[in-house]
Amino acid sequence: MARIAGINIPTHKHAWVALTSIYGIGRTRALSICNAAGVPHDRRVRDLNDAEVEALRQEVGNYVIEGDLRRSVAMDIKRLMDLGCYRGMRHRRGLPVRGQQTQTNARTRKGPRRGPASR
């Protein structure tokens, strides 16, 4: 298996699809990384030579991904909660942040319904 950014990417998949298994790299970014590294995106990872894998590593290193990205997102949410702004309060209360209605929906964000016995 090829190891890029501390992640073992699947060898049986095409290069661009395998790159999407890294947190922070989606389809568009994976294709642009393959183009910048000069790697044909439709070639499977097991068929890449060491130079191509190293070129992919170099290109992936230019982006904020994996642990750094997760930490950055968590710090952004924590900053909103510390500020006490509307979005921070919604995060703190576990409610939808982006203006969705909550009277009837938002079950994913609010969690399962509690019956009268558990209140």
From Swiss-Prot:
Similarity section: Belongs to the universal ribosomal protein uS13 family.
One Gene Ontology cellular component: small ribosomal subunit
Function: Located at the top of the head of the 30S subunit, it contacts several helices of the 16S rRNA. In the 70S ribosome it contacts the 23S rRNA (bridge B1a) and protein L5 of the 50S subunit (bridge B1b), connecting the 2 subunits; these bridges are implicated in subunit movement. Contacts the tRNAs in the A and P-sites.
Source species, domain of life: Bacteria
The protein's name in its UniProt record: Small ribosomal subunit protein uS13
Coiled coil segments of this chain: none
Keyword terms of this UniProt record: Ribonucleoprotein, Ribosomal protein, RNA-binding, rRNA-binding, tRNA-binding
Disordered: annotated span: 92-119
Subunit structure: Part of the 30S ribosomal subunit. Forms a loose heterodimer with protein S19. Forms two bridges to the 50S subunit in the 70S ribosome.
InterPro entries: Rbsml_uS13_C (IPR027437), Ribosomal_uS13 (IPR001892), Ribosomal_uS13-like_H2TH (IPR010979), Ribosomal_uS13_bac-type (IPR019980), Ribosomal_uS13_CS (IPR018269)
Biological process terms in GO annotation: translation
GO molecular function: rRNA binding; structural constituent of ribosome; tRNA binding
NCBIfam families assigned: uS13_bact
